[in-house]
């Protein structure tokens, strides 16, 4: 059972009168961000993957766990970064290793966005990338920084196919001193993880940490969505019966915390560590008896206890104070009628169970207060990364970060030995503080804050043996954005390179640290729901899963692809040095076979001359090389490589350019599970009824229930989808193909 330290403990790291440490929930700076979008804490952005065969397989940290396949283990992905955060850069020593540097987020107004690649065709079509990755797709929901984005479900699944991202060596080392602001719109639906803090006493909900840099007047539009709209959207996804019963419940019935359920305070001698320091697990961890080290000194939990009345109170205050912020965009949940958005400003905290079961090594209550792990800080480095790389790329980046830090450590050790006869100490003992709000790195001896990251800024954490890699997103000021974003003119938003801060730690509890952070996302999301009068149990997907299991997969795609008459092997003749003369686009994540689609052919080119190809055909392989699951850029490179050949062998599946979608929705309470922006499908929830029906990311909706929506306003498309029940018939095609066919884009033949 979890134990928390008494608030009166003098040695608590949260007692700021004694020493710096994590800020208690009720003592957070007044200017902290107070906005809490619904998507803020959806833990579905986390993926689990293992590097050790003996790693346990925790369930996915999701509120809506639709996916039958749980990722196996303990590296966590938060592919939810759309907006950006200001973070203090770490000044680098000559050898490139950083120690004892304060590192704090300067702007807690971080908000993830969901765009459609800035315009209409999102790089999320990339999801078809790695074949394995398609099944491990990241599921997130966020607000968009683009035009109007409307969510059709509580989560979506996306993985980005540009999985050939090289780890740039030209920017190899530690963090630069200046902060720089990421500045791009990106589409794939993701969710942002927002810290929730008490609002400012003056009612200002601008949302910035004490380290926030001065903003210009032009940044007003970056303020986040008002929370009442978000709460309204959540409630629309619930049945009216459950909402009524929830709202009638009284706060007096909230589960009481046992006052005796706290541990003895750790004395200062317990927290100080000498050269023979042993690392101890928090008492809150649910470890099997054989795993616990009874002889280890328990640094235990250094937390602040809140009463049951206080806990729901501070997030609830934000509901009242968050209304003044302008909405960056309009967003509707297509789970129910879109006109039911009038939710009272004040909400009663219903008597819901404290927590729905959240798999993980910690007690949920302890994660709210914060737990501490002992670790050694090895160093930090910086990598360039795409906005949302695949899980494989994330792991490659983590390994690259470890390699860099170890090289820097080795160089520093050699240099120190050369300058002095003394022993070169390159390890820094730290306390790794994890809570549902933030992750802090504290000097184990002085308890000084070395690094401070809001939980929502953590994009990935992996354990590699006894090494923990923590990746956090950086936000860059617009004036320096060009120095930090590597891109080429005309490049897609998803192809831009963004700076990622990587901290490397060593701990015997590496796997538990990774799992605890993943669990923290889930607990934070449930806290947000409870604070706004929504019973987390109402979001149970059992009934929804029963509906899904009765539906056929991919509409009629299986029949079409299994029909041998549609599968053809073609031989094309061409002149040496002549291009094939085609334009290909991605089939879109969600298609049964993620590959490229023939979108256009050059008049008089080899492809058009043959008369064997048609627009809409899916190319399975070229000269024996399979294109299934490969990123678009890789497929284009293979086609370009045919220039000096005189014969080309193609395996294709003949398909019409328009895809037929059939979604079976028995009732409005069942979420559709995809989001739309300006007629483009931006995100898709893995395992949802939309995926079953053939919805594909990156496709433009052409027709809904027999009515053309090509020239229909975005709001009307959303309304039509929101109110549709029964069988929903749609016709879609890749957005890039639509733009080519309508003359909105000039084809670039290859």
Curated annotation (Swiss-Prot):
Any single Pfam family the record assigns to this protein: PDZ
The protein's name in its UniProt record: Amyloid-beta A4 precursor protein-binding family A member 2
Keyword Kinase: no
Biological process annotations from GO: chemical synaptic transmission; in utero embryonic development; locomotory behavior; multicellular organism growth; presynaptic modulation of chemical synaptic transmission; protein transport; regulation of gene expression; synaptic vesicle exocytosis
Domain notes: Composed of an N-terminal domain that binds STXBP1, a middle phosphotyrosine-binding domain (PID/PTB) that mediates binding with the cytoplasmic domain of the amyloid-beta precursor protein, and two C-terminal PDZ domains thought to attach proteins to the plasma membrane.
InterPro entries, A to Z: APP-Binding (IPR051230), PDZ (IPR001478), PDZ_sf (IPR036034), PH-like_dom_sf (IPR011993), PTB/PI_dom (IPR006020)
Name of the gene encoding the protein in the UniProt record: Apba2
GO cellular component term of the entry, any: cytosol
Ribonucleoprotein recorded as keyword: no
PANTHER family membership: AMYLOID-BETA A4 PRECURSOR PROTEIN-BINDING FAMILY A MEMBER 2, SYNTENIN RELATED
Complex and partners: Part of a multimeric complex containing STXBP1 and syntaxin-1. Binds to the cytoplasmic domain of amyloid-beta protein, and to the nuclear factor NF-kappa-B/p65 via its PDZ domain. Interacts with the N-terminal domain of NECAB3.
SUPFAM superfamilies from the UniProt entry: PDZ domain-like (SSF50156), PH domain-like (SSF50729)
Regions of compositional bias (Polar residues) in chain numbering: 70-80, 332-344
UniProtKB keywords: Phosphoprotein, Protein transport, Repeat, Transport
């Amino acid at each position: 059972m979890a134990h928390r330290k008494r608030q009166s403990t003098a040695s608590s790291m949260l007692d700021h009168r004694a020493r710096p440490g994590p800020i208690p929930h009720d003592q957070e700076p007044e200017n902290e961000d107070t906005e809490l979008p619904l998507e803020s804490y959806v833990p579905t952005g986390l993926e689990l993957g293992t590097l050790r065969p003996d790693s346990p397989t925790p369930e996915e940290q999701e509120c809506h766990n639709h996916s039958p396949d749980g990722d196996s283990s303990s590296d966590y992905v938060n592919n939810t970064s759309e907006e950006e955060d200001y973070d203090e850069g770490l000044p680098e020593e000559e050898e490139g290793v950083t120690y004892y540097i304060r590192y704090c987020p300067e702007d807690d107004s971080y908000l993830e966005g969901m765009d459609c690649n800035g315009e209409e065709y999102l790089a999320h079509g990339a999801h078809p990338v790695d074949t394995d990755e398609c099944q491990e797709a990241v599921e997130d929901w966020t607000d968009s920084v683009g035009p109007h984005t409307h969510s059709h479900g509580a989560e979506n699944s996306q993985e980005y196919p540009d999985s050939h991202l090289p780890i740039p060596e030209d920017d190899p080392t530690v963090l630069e001193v200046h902060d720089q602001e990421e500045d791009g719109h990106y589409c794939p639906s993701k969710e942002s993880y927002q810290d929730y803090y008490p609002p400012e006493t003056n009612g200002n909900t601008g949302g910035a940490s004490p380290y926030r840099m001065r903003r210009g007047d032009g940044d007003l539009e970056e303020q986040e969505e008002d929370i009442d709209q978000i709460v309204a959207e959540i409630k629309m996804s619930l049945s009216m019966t459950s909402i009524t019963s929830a709202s009638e419940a009284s706060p007096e019935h909230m589960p009481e915390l046992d006052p005796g359920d706290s541990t003895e305070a750790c004395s200062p001698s317990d927290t100080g560590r000498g050269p023979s320091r042993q690392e101890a697990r928090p008492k809150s961890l649910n470890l099997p008896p054989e795993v616990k080290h009874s002889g280890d000194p328990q640094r235990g939990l250094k937390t602040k206890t809140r009463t049951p009345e206080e806990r729901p109170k501070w997030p609830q205050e934000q509901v009242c104070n968050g209304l003044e912020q302008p909405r960056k965009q309009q967003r509707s949940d297509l789970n129910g009628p879109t006109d039911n958005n009038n939710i009272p400003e004040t909400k009663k905290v219903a008597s819901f169970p404290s927590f729905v079961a959240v798999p993980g090594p910690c007690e949920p209550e302890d994660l709210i207060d914060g737990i501490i792990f002992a670790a050694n800080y090895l160093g930090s480095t910086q990598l360039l990364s795409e906005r949302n790389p695949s899980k494989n790329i994330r792991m490659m980046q983590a390994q690259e970060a470890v390699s860099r830090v170890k090289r820097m450590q080795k160089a520093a050790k050699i240099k120190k030995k050369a300058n002095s006869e003394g022993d070169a100490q390159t390890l820094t003992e730290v306390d790794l503080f994890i809570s549902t709000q933030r992750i802090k790195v504290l000097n184990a001896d002085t308890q000084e804050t070395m690094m401070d990251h809001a939980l929502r800024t953590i994009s990935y954490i992996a354990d590699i043996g006894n090494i923990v890699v923590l990746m956090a997103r950086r936000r860059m000021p617009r004036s320096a954005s060009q120095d930090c974003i590597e891109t080429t003119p005309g490049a897609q938003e998803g192809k831009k390179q963004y700076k990622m801060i990587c901290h490397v730690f060593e701990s015997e509890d590496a796997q538990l640290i990774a799992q605890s952070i993943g669990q923290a996302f889930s607990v934070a999301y449930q806290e947000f729901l409870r604070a706004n009068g929504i019973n987390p149990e109402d979001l149970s997907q059992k009934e929804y899963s029963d509906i899904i299991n009765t539906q056929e997969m991919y509409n009629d795609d299986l029949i079409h692809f299994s029909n041998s008459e549609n599968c053809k092997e073609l031989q094309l003749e061409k002149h040496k040095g002549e291009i094939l003369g085609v334009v290909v686009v991605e089939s879109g994540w969600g298609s049964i076979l993620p590959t490229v689609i023939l979108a256009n052919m050059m008049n008089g080119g080899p492809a058009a001359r043959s008369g064997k190809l048609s627009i809409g055909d899916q190319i399975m392989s070229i000269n024996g090389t399979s294109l299934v699951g490969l990123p678009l850029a890789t497929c284009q490179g293979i086609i370009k490589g045919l220039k000096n050949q005189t014969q080309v062998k193609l395996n294709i599946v003949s398909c019409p350019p328009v895809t037929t979608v059939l979604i079976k929705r028995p009732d409005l309470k069942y979420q559709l599970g995809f989001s739309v922006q300006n007629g483009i499908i931006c995100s898709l929830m893995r395992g949802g009824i939309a995926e079953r029906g053939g919805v594909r990311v990156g496709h433009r909706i052409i027709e809904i229930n027999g009515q053309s929506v090509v020239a229909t306003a975005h709001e009307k498309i959303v309304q039509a989808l929101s109110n549709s029940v029964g069988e929903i018939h749609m016709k879609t095609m890749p957005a890039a193909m639509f733009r080519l066919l309508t003359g909105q884009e000039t084809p670039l033949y290859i």
